């Protein structure tokens, strides 16, 4: 599939050119990201399995809120992406003072956004769930409101952690965020087990350990950022710098708009599924958990893509930009082929881990089969390649493509197949594959055209 990107560009570096990244440096960057993503998805699966012991109303309420939670998380991630791109570009241009300044601005913006969004979600939890999902069963609604109000308290700390982790990725040291993520997830999963099985707390037992783990993670990452021997010197006194903030937000806002609308679209299609009852909601939640395993390598490599391409763009080296984009995409195809192949091979055993009824289990198996089979082919070009364009400041194009593809293909066909034709969750997942096909076409053509080369200005 990576041959689609070739166009008129060379597929390797000139012999005399000094590469910006060695094979070892790429692995040092990518492997910890892979482990971090694995931890995140594994803990998410553990949360779902544990709360499933509290009944299908509880798992449905938590899964519906997790869609809103993902919407919030992508806002923080988009802001972190904007900061990571700017820092990487300054490092590529060997402009250390501005790299330090942009690092401080990222942390400041992350903290402010976390406080504002957390307060809004806490106060408006019930109206938000009603807005997104309309009329749902009362016990599902009550579980969702309780979960969202508690988890909203963690948003400021999650935003700070994401910002700090992005800074370490931008300098090629993803090991730090991996270590802190490991501790955060251990706290979370142990806390869940104690609260759910020991204290019989229900959805509270999933939410409170998440809050505690994120507080610890934020404290640790900030301590690392302000160490005297840190590669980046983050200013101890943070004041808003209009010019630098504008540069970060110039990448972060389009990415946030794109990703938040993408997640909002996912929430809308889940709201279509929710009209078919608890069986479809629960099967969709379990399928999302398992499919998260399949895309772990792709997500890790897409994060590495931001650092690598951002550094190449800052150095003004388009040849290396193309070379490393293709290299990382090849890695994504190989690793995602292995991960999704393993899921398909052991699918029934994996779904059997969850406490599901027979009907729910069979539907979950069907949904995972659709996703895993198609992700091997379409996912890397749909979601890894766009990060190369973002790192080159071509954020408006990726935003427009993602929004239009979501609106026209995923939402449109979800309504047609799920609601009008009565396919339920299966119709939504078929529409997802149609959306991926559109994204692949647009992003490949854009990369081949070379239009992204004109977007970065030092």
Regions found by a protein language model. Name each.
Residues 1-30, 87-154, 196-253, 309-375, ...:
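Short alpha-helical transmembrane segments in multi-pass integral membrane proteins
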Residues 17-49, 53-54, 70-82, 86, ...:
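N-terminal transmembrane alpha-helices
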Residues 28, 51-70, 138-143, 203-204, ...:
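Interfacial/gating helices of multi-pass transporter permease domains
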Residues 28-47, 150, 184, 213-217, ...:
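Transmembrane helical elements of multi-pass membrane transporters/channels
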Residues 37-38, 74, 114, 118, ...:
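Residue-level hotspots within the lipid-embedded alpha helices of multi-pass solute transporters
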Residues 38-60, 129-138, 194-201, 260-293, ...:
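Helix-terminus/linker motif at the lipid-water interface of multi-pass membrane proteins
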Residues 59-119, 158-177, 270, 281-347, ...:
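Small-residue-rich hydrophobic transmembrane alpha-helices
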Residues 80, 150-169, 177-188, 206-221, ...:
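Short runs within selected transmembrane alpha-helices of multi-pass transporters and secretion channels
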């Amino acid at each position: 599939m990576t041959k689609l990107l070739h166009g008129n560009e060379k597929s390797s570096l000139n012999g005399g050119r000094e590469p910006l990244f060695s094979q070892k440096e790429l692995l040092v960057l990518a492997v910890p990201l892979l482990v971090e993503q694995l931890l995140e998805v594994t803990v998410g699966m553990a949360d779902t399995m544990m709360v499933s012991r509290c009944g299908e109303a509880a798992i449905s309420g938590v899964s519906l809120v997790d869609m809103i939670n993902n919407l919030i998380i992508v806002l923080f991630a988009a802001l972190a992406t904007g900061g990571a791109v700017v820092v990487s570009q300054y490092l590529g241009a060997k402009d250390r003072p501005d790299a330090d300044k942009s690092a401080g601005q990222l942390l400041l913006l992350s903290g402010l956004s976390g406080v504002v969004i957390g307060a809004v979600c806490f106060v408006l939890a019930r109206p938000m769930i009603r807005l997104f999902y309309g009329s749902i069963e009362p016990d599902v609604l009550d579980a969702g409101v309780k979960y969202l109000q508690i988890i909203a308290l963690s948003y400021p700390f999650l935003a700070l952690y994401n910002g700090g982790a992005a800074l370490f990725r931008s300098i090629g040291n993803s090991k730090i965020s991996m270590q802190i993520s490991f501790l955060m997830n251990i706290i979370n999963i142990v806390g869940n087990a104690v609260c759910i099985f020991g204290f019989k707390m229900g959805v509270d037992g999933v939410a409170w350990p998440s809050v505690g783990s994120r507080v610890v993670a934020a404290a640790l990452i900030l301590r690392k950022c302000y160490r005297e021997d840190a590669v980046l010197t983050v200013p101890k006194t943070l004041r808003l710098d209009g010019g630098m903030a504008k540069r970060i937000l110039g990448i972060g806002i389009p990415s946030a708009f794109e990703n938040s609308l993408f997640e909002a679209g996912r929430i809308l299609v889940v709201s279509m599924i929710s009209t078919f009852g608890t069986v479809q909601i629960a099967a969709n939640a379990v399928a999302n958990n398992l499919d998260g395993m399949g895309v772990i390598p792709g997500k890790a490599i897409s994060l590495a893509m931001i650092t690598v391409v951002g550094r190449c763009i800052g150095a003004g080296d388009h040849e290396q930009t193309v070379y490393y984009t293709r290299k990382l995409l090849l890695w994504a195809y190989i690793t995602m082929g292995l991960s999704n192949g393993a899921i398909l091979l052991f699918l029934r055993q994996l779904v059997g881990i969850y406490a599901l009824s027979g009907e729910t289990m069979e539907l979950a198996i069907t949904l995972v089969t659709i996703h895993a089979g198609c992700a091997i082919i379409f996912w890397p070009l749909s979601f890894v390649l766009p990060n190369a364009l973002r790192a080159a400041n071509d954020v408006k194009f990726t935003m427009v493509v993602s929004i239009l593809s979501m609106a026209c293909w995923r939402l449109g066909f979800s309504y047609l197949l799920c609601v009008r034709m009565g396919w339920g969750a299966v119709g939504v997942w078929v529409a997802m594959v149609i959306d991926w096909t559109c994204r692949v076409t647009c992003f490949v053509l854009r990369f081949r055209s070379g239009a992204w080369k004109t977007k970065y200005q030092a």
